[in-house]
Amino acid sequence: MNAKIIASLAFTSMFSLSTLLSPAHSEEQEKALNFGIISTESQQNLKLQWTPFLQDMEKKLGVKVNAFFAPDYAGIIQGMRFNKVDIAWYGNLSAMEAVDRANGQVFAQTVAADGSPGYWSVLIVNKDSPINNLNDLLAKRKDLTFGNGDPNSTSGFLVPGYYVFAKNNISASDFKRTVNAGHETNALAVANKQVDVATNNTENLDKLKTSAPEKLKELKVIWKSPLIPGDPIVWRKNLSETTKDKIYDFFMNYGKTPEEKAVLERLGWAPFRASSDLQLVPIRQLALFKEMQGVKSNKGLNEQDKLAKTTEIQAQLDDLDRLNNALSAMSSVSKAVQ
């Protein structure tokens, strides 16, 4: 991501808020909406969890709302890029890709059912495994099979990629064998002893309490990441303002009745809260930190090329730091006014 994109984030997010608060334009409302759902679990499980929510959304908006599934996260991003997906539930990393490459815009954020401001990436092994912590894993990695996450997954790929691999100067390729899959597939593979260790997250493990409780009993968590912000809900920027107003109103008011709360609980969430592209700033920093580590450890680059690339990455990190400082200052002023 270049500096111009970073610099425009604050303006874009503030502009989107003013747009939401302005009167609806006279554009024609979309007659149907496709809702993208990332492939964290089997399509069968996702349909069971999401159908009641999408039905409620359809009733409120007065238009058909179709579930849109794809075999991987990239399929949802590409669907939005080519106007086949109108709204989507993403992880933070896939949302970043949708914002940068698919004309997406964050407008809401999930909140965990217990009120937590986010969730955690984890590494799991079978309960019978002699691996009990990260040090054990790092020491024995060349003898282990590893279930990595989807390359566009925040908790399954980016976060462990930085905190487990980049910070310890190792690579996923160090394992005896590495495969990529979604959270549910990885969890079941560990439970069935098909892989030795895999990435996952606390939200998905909670869902296994219902979908596969016996398999959950076979798992052991050996590492837990720092907190990851709640998942973004993203729409296409070029949706009509009339449709955006209705979608925003639905999300900001959903979950107030016992029936709606039950629907959200099935998804592992409490009522949504407003958000913007700015929630992706920490994830952008993480991606850049990981990229920096990769450049520094790349033996195929000479020192001059390394310096040029790291200088460019550092400039982007500096831009993000300034943006964070500005946001903190704005937040302090807002609290003082209140």
Residue ranges of model-derived segments:
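An extracytoplasmic/periplasmic, membrane-proximal ligand-sensing/linker region
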Residues: 30, 42, 48, 52, ...
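Bilobed "Venus flytrap"/periplasmic-binding protein-like clamshell domains
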Residues: 30-58, 70, 93, 116, ...
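A ligand-binding cleft/hinge motif common to bilobed small-molecule-binding domains
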Residues: 89-102, 165-166, 191-192, 196-217, ...
